[in-house]
Amino acid sequence: MGMIQEFKEFAVKGNAMDLAVGVIIGGAFGKIVDSIVGDLIMPLVSRVVGKLDFSNLFFVLGDNPNNLTALADLKKAGIAVFAYGSFLTILVNFIILAFIIFMMVKQMNRMRKEEPAAPAEAPATPEDVLLLREIRDSLKK
């Protein structure tokens, strides 16, 4: 069997196709979660905290001789900063995404349990039992 034929068989197997679909849907779903976090949740959190832009939250670790206040300006000047705002946004994003995936998996597991088990097929009668039945029936005659 040639390598191209093997690749075709691999590519059209269910697992490879399921993985491809999952990656595509996951990418689109990630954008939805980014929008929920960035456009809905973080503005509410920033309203409570008092900061509108979390990505601009940081601590200056080095000397700041020019008294720069913007994170981009500090980084451009080469001043050491501990930028935790972007991390907070990404952390909230991750927690929401993980919770949604958990709920989806939980629902899928519940649906699997609810499906009735297919009735087991009766196993084929062994040959020796068939032979014994045939002998018994012959003796009855």
Swiss-Prot record:
Name of the protein in its database record: Large-conductance mechanosensitive channel
One cellular component term from this protein's GO annotations in UniProt: plasma membrane
Function: Channel that opens in response to stretch forces in the membrane lipid bilayer. May participate in the regulation of osmotic pressure changes within the cell.
Bilayer topology annotation: Multi-pass membrane protein
Gene Ontology MF terms in the entry: mechanosensitive monoatomic ion channel activity
Subcellular location: Cell inner membrane
Organism: Dechloromonas aromatica (strain RCB)
Keyword field: Cell inner membrane, Cell membrane, Ion channel, Ion transport, Membrane, Transmembrane, Transmembrane helix, Transport
Subunit structure: Homopentamer.
Similarity annotation: Belongs to the MscL family.
Matching Pfam families: MscL (PF01741)
NCBIfam families recorded: mscL, PRK00567.1-4, PRK13952.1
Gene: mscL
InterPro entries, per the entry: MS_channel (IPR001185), MSC/AndL (IPR037673), MscL_channel (IPR036019)
Taxonomy, superkingdom: Bacteria
Regions crossing the membrane: 21-41, 85-105
